[in-house]
From Swiss-Prot:
It catalyses: Endonucleolytic cleavage to 5'-phosphomonoester. It is found in: Cytoplasm. It comes from Dehalococcoides mccartyi (strain CBDB1). Manganese or magnesium. Binds 1 divalent metal ion per monomer in the absence of substrate. May bind a second metal ion after substrate binding. Belongs to the RNase HII family. Residues 22-212 form the RNase H type-2 domain. CDD domains: RNase_HII_bacteria_HII_like. Its cofactor is Mn(2+); Mg(2+). The gene is rnhB. GO terms for biological process: DNA replication, removal of RNA primer; mismatch repair. NCBIfam families: PRK00015.1-3. Its EC number is 3.1.26.4. This is Ribonuclease HII. It comes from the Bacteria. Keywords: Cytoplasm, Endonuclease, Hydrolase, Manganese, Metal-binding, Nuclease.
Length: 212
């Protein structure tokens, strides 16, 4: 029996608008657990009224096919009040750790918006460095419409970046696995070595380095 796919709701946004908040931004990240490349965050402010079949297709980016993510990305960025993207590279991730790096990418994404939101809906995290009212929602990318939209923006933005890095660092098949720790990726690292865009503090790469 196939797993049930949750349809994100706009209940949080509706409740916040009743409380007087207008510019409500959803925030999510992509690439947190990868072995290579940056962690990327998306921030999106969607208008309260949206029409079109695509609206009902929005889901957590992880359950969508690449083609559907691209399709939805185009609608989201064209209909958004504003959207922003932040990225923190592998060297910064190794230096500060993935949790602070993720928060920094989210802060960058908020700063990339063309207008300041008055409330943030964040997938799971709290962002103490951003002095705005906010709410962290567990599984927010599956449950909350604005966060689901942000997850798609983050994922598509990162996937496009990894496809570019694939041309700069051939032989790792980055466009295929997007830097995640697949068997193919680990095999390529074993054969070619660790590249300048790999996260050296992440297992199994740290073990490879420590074993040298």
């Amino acid at each position: 029996m196939p797993a049930t796919v949750i349809c994100p709701s706009r209940a949080e946004e509706k409740l916040l608008r009743k409380q007087g908040f207008i510019l409500i931004a959803g925030l999510d990240e992509a690439g947190r657990g990868c072995l290579a490349g940056p962690v990327v965050a998306g921030a999106v402010i969607m208008p309260p009224r949206l029409k079109g079949d695509w609206v009902e297709m929005v889901r957590d980016s992880k359950v969508l096919s690449p083609a559907k993510r691209e399709y939805l990305y185009c609608h989201i960025v064209s209909m958004a009040v504003t959207f922003g993207v932040g990225a923190v590279d592998n060297e910064q991730i190794d230096s500060m750790g993935i949790a602070p790096a993720t928060r920094l990418a989210m802060k960058q994404a908020v700063e990339d918006l063309t207008c300041q939101p008055d409330f943030l809906l964040v997938d799971y995290l709290k962002l103490p460095d951003i002095p705005l009212p906010q709410k962290g929602i567990v599984n927010g990318d599956a449950l909350c419409f604005s966060i689901a939209c942000a997850s798609i923006v983050a994922k598509v933005s990162r996937d496009r970046l990894m496809s570019k890095l694939d041309m700069e660092y051939p032989g790792y098949y980055l466009a295929k696995h997007k830097g995640y720790g697949t068997a193919l990726h680990v095999e390529c690292i074993c054969q070619k070595g660790i590249s300048p865009i790999h996260r050296r503090t992440f297992a199994p790469l740290k073990g490879m380095i420590d074993g040298l």
